[in-house]
């Protein structure tokens, strides 16, 4: 076991804390156990049954502190950040664990470009100085030779024209994410790359403007490090998205979050996988090399 990594991690996290404090962000803590689950697509929350006052009730371990922090922002509209453990069911591999450390931060009065600027400054502290910002459509054309379209039939026709194999029964999202995995392999350079302007179908909690989601993802050495967007504050739009996300899943919709959204001034938010960023900074190939990370056999 490389015990020096414990010291490196301590300094790494403290440097991040000091950076956000110096920028005027408030560090906050919110409960890991939540009454409502995060309803994100492709992420499965962990359910916990607790006995309280003689009655058993279901709670969820948060997959991110997003919902709780947004509820806090509704009553305390201030730039804020949190560093916390998060939990996701069914994730295990070189870059995935059911438990990991997340940095979540929110910035009032700015769109997602303000988050990118703060991330650039943060990355400067760890020796990253040269950055690339690339629109997702252009990335598909440059690296994969594919013209991306949100229309399923047009995308399939484009793939046939470029000689890509696919099952015609596959839907748009399945095809997109298969191609996206190929794109990730092309982003293996040392230069941090911000992919911006996502398809509106993939807006998540973000604003859609001029046909694109105001969303970005940060890649370093082919690893997704961060994910952020200009936050959508219209509860009806988010409700419709959440209904789609929880369809065929036994998950309730967080009504408290929907009530909070209109109370928040214009803002943007970002999540960062800290072990992954640590890997990029210290040239670590796998989460297996990080001694404190969750593993099947324990520490």
Q: What do these predicted ranges mean?
A:
Residues 1-49, 272:
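TRNA-binding/sensing appendages of the translation machinery
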Residues 13, 17, 116-123, 239:
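Hydrophobic face of alpha-helices
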Residues 25-28, 78-83, 128-131:
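Short secondary-structure capping/junction motifs at helix and strand boundaries
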Residues 31-36, 43-71, 81-108, 151-299:
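A translation/RNA-centric and nucleic-acid-associated enzymatic feature enriched
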Residues 108-142, 154:
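Acidic, low-complexity central loop/insert segments
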Residues 145-148:
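Conserved, well-structured core segments that form or line functional sites
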């Amino acid at each position: 076991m490389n015990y020096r990594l414990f010291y490196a991690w301590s300094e790494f996290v403290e440097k991040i804390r000091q950076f956000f404090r110096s920028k005027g962000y408030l560090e906050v803590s919110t409960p890991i156990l939540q009454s409502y689950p995060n309803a994100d697509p492709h992420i499965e929350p962990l359910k916990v049954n607790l006995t309280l006052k003689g009655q058993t009730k279901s709670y969820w371990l948060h997959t991110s502190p997003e919902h709780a922090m947004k509820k806090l922002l509704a009553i305390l509209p201030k730039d804020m950040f949190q560093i916390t453990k998060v939990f996701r069911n069914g994730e295990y591999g070189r870059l995935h664990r059911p438990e990991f450390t997340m940095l979540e931060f929110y910035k009032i009065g700015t769109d997602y470009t303000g988050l990118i600027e703060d991330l650039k400054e943060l990355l400067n502290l760890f020796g990253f100085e040269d950055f690339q910002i690339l629109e997702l459509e252009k990335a598909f054309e440059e690296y994969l030779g594919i013209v991306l379209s949100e229309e399923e039939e047009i995308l399939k026709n484009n793939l046939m024209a470029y000689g890509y194999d696919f099952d015609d029964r596959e839907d748009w999202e399945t095809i997109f994410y298969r191609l996206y995995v190929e794109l990730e392999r092309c982003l293996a350079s040392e230069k941090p790359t911000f992919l911006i302007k996502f398809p509106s179908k993939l807006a998540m909690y973000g604003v859609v403007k001029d046909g694109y989601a105001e969303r970005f993802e940060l890649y370093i050495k082919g690893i997704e490090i961060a994910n952020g967007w200009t936050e959508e504050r219209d509860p009806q739009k988010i409700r419709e998205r959440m209904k789609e996300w929880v369809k065929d899943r036994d998950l309730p919709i967080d009504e408290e979050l929907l009530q909070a959204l209109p109370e928040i001034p214009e803002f943007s938010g970002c999540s960062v996988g800290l072990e992954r960023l640590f890997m990029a900074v210290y040239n670590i190939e796998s989460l297996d090399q990080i001694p404190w990370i969750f593993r099947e056999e324990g520490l």
